[in-house]
Amino acid sequence: MAQYECSEHMENFLRELPKCEHHVHLEGTLEPSLLFKLAKRNNITLPETFPKTVEECNDRYNRFADLQDFLDHYYIGMGVLITENDFYDLAMDYFTKAHSDGCLHSEVFFDPQGHVERNIDIDVVVQGFNRACKDANTKYGTTNKLIMCLLRHLPAENGLQTIHSASKYYQDGIIHGLGLDSSEKPFPPNLFTECYAHIKDNFPEVGLTAHAGEEGDHTFVSDALNLLKVSRIDHGVNSHQSEELMQRLAEQKTLLSLCPLSNVKLQVVKDVKELPIDKFFQMNVPFSINSDDPAYFGGYILDNYKAVHTRFGFTKDQWKIIALNGIKGSWCDDQRKNELISLVEEVYKKYNIEGC
């Protein structure tokens, strides 16, 4: 993979700049070291073809052929997560790393169907992740929210059953959003209209988002907006194929949760510079920069910020706008948004006073 480096001053600015992460899969933060630790702890035998060491894992993760190749490894890794403490440890490791990168608000995905089909109760999953959210909030002064994703390669009926089984967590405000992930092209948004309608009708305060326009074309984005009634699009890089869609995203202030290093790792593009990030900026399409599955793609949120800066050379003024758009597009309350906005202003002022 290409190297992305920037000046020490700019890296410090980007590190301190308060960030919101809207697109990270907790199962995708499973570092090889924790994967092997949990496999041993839970007496899990990994497939014979799976890498045997941390080094071999990292090497294999550097050679994903496409989205499906990654997903095959992703689901194997998921298999070592068994107990509530496993899910807690996984999430706390992520929150600790994200905080060190200057991430103050996270809205994190998890895939309950991938665990339930392994006979792991959804309560084990949610309670482990929720406990980590609470502990991270207390320890780091951050805010963290859970978004339950449906796996689009599974039948929509299964997704609806999963929503019903998670209803109490939506009711209690423990799960804050609904998302849609996994293989995109064979499973378009129209398959999941009933799932999204159920959430919208029964829990209107819950945020709706969906992966769209990563491998699928711009019509996947339009369909997610029109049919699923989402207020956010995950990835959405192919939105640039339609000027009409771009104008709509800008006018409606629909946030795209971009994942630059993920797009390179999964062969969507060869280099971050090929992404239409500058076009999104020029056309006032709001976006945030995110890590997606950092344990598999070799970069957490700061790494993605650095990669974008290296390739597009955004000024501190432009980075301030990106940070503010991320805050405004978050599903936290106005008080928290105002706190984060003030912190962005403080960091921006600090680095401008330094005169660089």
From Swiss-Prot:
It comes from the Eukaryota. Pfam families: A_deaminase. GO terms for cellular component: cytoplasm; nucleus. Its cofactor is Zn(2+). Catalyzes the hydrolytic deamination of adenine to hypoxanthine. Plays an important role in the purine salvage pathway and in nitrogen catabolism. Its EC number is 3.5.4.2. This is Adenine deaminase. It comes from Candida albicans (strain SC5314 / ATCC MYA-2876) (Yeast). Zn(2+) binds at residues 23, 25, 211, 292. InterPro entries: A/AMP_deam_AS (IPR006650), A_deaminase_dom (IPR001365), ADE (IPR028892), Ado/ade_deaminase (IPR006330), Metal_Hydrolase (IPR032466). Its main location: cytoplasm. It is found in: Cytoplasm; Nucleus. Gene3D superfamilies: Metal-dependent hydrolases (3.20.20.140). Keywords: Cytoplasm, Hydrolase, Metal-binding, Nucleotide metabolism, Nucleus, Zinc. Belongs to the metallo-dependent hydrolases superfamily. Adenosine and AMP deaminases family. Adenine deaminase type 2 subfamily. PANTHER family: ADENINE DEAMINASE. The record marks 235 as: Important for catalytic activity.
